[in-house]
Amino acid sequence: MYAVVKTGGKQYKVAAGEKLKVEQIPADIGAEITLDQVLAVGAGDQIKFGTPLVSGASVKATVIAQGRHDKVKIFKMRRRKHYQKRQGHRQNYTELRIEAIVA
């Protein structure tokens, strides 16, 4: 069984037992969270789509880590104008383990 969930403005296809890195969710490590925005649920060749959400469906997950992605380096330059700008960015993430899909 799998589900398509929406969290942090992005959509993820998940199944029970998988690990998933999503945009940061303010929760403690080991906390049980529920993802309520389920867009689709499927098992085998049967798929149930929501309009826009599947009613009564949710995904149970456990927070296993909070971290930061690798640094992304931004470099801007204007040729012949002596303009250079450097910037870096590290995005926070939450790593989840999908425990169960309730549909």
Swiss-Prot record:
It comes from the Bacteria. One of its GO terms (cellular component) is cytoplasm. Keywords: Ribonucleoprotein, Ribosomal protein, RNA-binding, rRNA-binding. Part of the 50S ribosomal subunit. Contacts protein L20. This protein binds to 23S rRNA in the presence of protein L20. Belongs to the bacterial ribosomal protein bL21 family. This is Large ribosomal subunit protein bL21. The gene is rplU.
